[in-house]
Amino acid sequence: LASVVKHWLKLFNNVNCFFSEDYYIFYKSLKNLYYFWSMMVSRDNGEAPNVDDKFGLEWTNEVATDWKAAAVKRGYWVDPFIYWFQQPKQNILRFPEMLRGYYARVKGIRIVVEQFLDKFAPACQIINFGAGFDTMYWNLSKEGRQIDLYLEIDLPDVVRKKINCILRHSSDLYSFACNEQLQMLIDRNDVMHTLNYHIMAGDLCNTDDLMEKFLSIPIDFSKPTLFLSECVLVYVNVDRTKNLLQMLSNKFAKACFLDYEPSNLNSIFGRKFLENMAQMKVSVSGASFCESVDSMRQIYEESGWSNFKSWKVSAVYLNSLPRQDRERVETLDLLDDPEMLNQMLDHYLFSVATNSDDQNLISIGFE
């Protein structure tokens, strides 16, 4: 049964089946059945679930999107576009610590993005690695923020699903000029190009392939460029991460890399994170990269990023997020144990690295 379900999942991933809501629901049901069957068989055998890395990494995107949608629904922040990609699942216990953690994550990233745009927009670029169902571009556009180029790169299946989700809401999009353009996008279901927004499937472990993707769109390697990465490099082999960082540092004249990752993976919390990923058969190939601040700093500096700074998310939450909004959020859900939130946020880091001595770039970061 599991092999039959997996065959149908692959078929659905390779055709444009998401324009009908019924097909989409059917796909989700198949996927849930596959996970359930894998979990049941593995439990009976006393093993971790037999879910391959590809589905496991897709799962991390869907989980993150679901938590973000739940936080938006609770009023933690405003994001009218999150529901394009995920409706929060009903009747699921939502731990306030997790909702608060996603609030710190989203708001922290937004602070850095706004700093970058305030200094360089519109003649600048943002490239989001492992973007998943991120909605940053749509929110920036809604607010009238101008940018020359915004590129998202992720796994082929994730990109296909995101494009189809966007096309299902095409009547809401002012970015698309005509039906002919939409038809072109349907024909190429793992690539989408608009005037300044691009989304493509790409392999971060293959820098030659990535460079081909860059050259296929109007990227300007001389313009200030902000790279975004949220819980991505922790899943990438450390040598591949070095190759990626070196290529970016060499090709882009003025670049800033904002990374959000788990850290201190040798702690009890870190070992639990690794255990959970192992149970889902997701390879945490970048565990040594995220082992500590020093390990991250060393890899960035060896890869050509001479200016590296990092902050625990707990410090950003307390010292850098707008106080009035933080106090508002803290009234939405009361914490049984505030120390649990602090411990969780202590094990995640924001890091900002630059490959240029440009003071506008170096000044980007948190207080």
Which residues make up each language-model segment?
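Conserved beta-strand signature within the Rossmann-like core of class I S-adenosyl-L-methionine
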Residues: F252-P262
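Rossmann-like AdoMet/SAM-dependent catalytic core
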Residues: I268-E367
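Cationic, low-complexity basic patches in intrinsically disordered or flexible, solvent-exposed regions
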Residues: H7, L11
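A short, conserved alpha-helix within the catalytic core of class I
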Residues: D209-K213, Y235-M247
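A short SAM/SAH-binding and catalytic strip from SAM-dependent methyltransferases
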Residues: T225-V238
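Short "lid" loop at the C-terminus of a central beta-strand within the Rossmann-like core
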Residues: V234, P262-S267
